[in-house]
Amino acid sequence: MRMYQWIVISIIVFLSSHSFAEAKSKITVKVMIVSMFGPEGEVWRSHRVLDRLTVVPGLLPADSAVHCGRDGVCQVTTGMGYANAAASISALIYSRQFDLQKTYWLIAGVAGINPARGTLGTAAWAHYLVDFGLQWELDKRDAPAAWPSGYLGINTMSPAEKPQLIYGTEVFKLNDELVNRAFSLSESVKLTDSPSAQKARAVYGYAPANAAPAVVQCDTLSSDTWFSGTHLTERADVWASELTDHHAVACTSQQEDNATFAVLMRAAGEHLVDTNRVAVLRTGSDFDRAPPGGSDASTLLNYQSAGGFEPAVMNLYLAGNTLVQEIAGHWSAWRRGVPPR
């Protein structure tokens, strides 16, 4: 009997010590910066000391490590598009190599920008993430003539009808307290610009498209399809407003954010992360529609020559680092949640 008790106690002690060692070995993260591809990640690695690398199975083969600093700030590159974003964030969280329960997440990447809401280099903090891809679609040539596009909500009868949100990932609302604080910390930051971006925006002839880049608050649309042009983007603007009962004001478009947040939401259900600690910053690298009298096809096909990419990448850091530094530098105030002002 005594031998049996000794064995049981030994097993319990072993398992307890193993669990303690596992918990102790986890890397505690104060801020996780989420980038989608190389240049978005490099701007952080070149301006912050993120020299502690942890390889995570399941991340991008070409960028398979999470880069961390001694101050609790880390950066991961997911890869572009929904599949890469979801796969990488899942791999990161479920690797159990990091303690992410109190982590603040900064999803920061370049995006298309609506010239009526911003310009090349604009840094936009989002309150809403809206999935543009979860719709029915007919080729416009096959749709009723009265429809403004071939898009309509799933299981609806017209483009003007709001659908039931049956997928659960159509719209995500971020924590207003965090978004507003991020904006207030960064709104006075002087953003960078370029001569080629100034030339590209001048042809729009109206503000804010032809003005200098600034930090703003407006919402973002996700879609695996890189959509562009007046008709599609007008539909996207309406769609964002429709799904949020006219609260969202869309200004940027990108290919990952709803997928990334969906993974975080699932993990939050297991108490692994806190979705009230997620901020999304998107910077305008290209216009999503043509200037008056211009060609939508030309705007899309020649987006790389507009000169917005370099300022957009740099402005991710300039605007986003204000939040990162505030959290990491005042962790005792932020650890329990967004502190009162």
How would you describe each model-predicted region?
Residues 14-21:
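C-terminal segment of classical bacterial N-terminal signal peptides
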Residues 22-341:
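Accessory terminal and edge-of-domain segments that mediate assembly/interaction
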Residues 1-5:
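Positively charged n-region of N-terminal signal peptides that target proteins for export
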Residues 6-14:
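Sec-dependent N-terminal signal peptides
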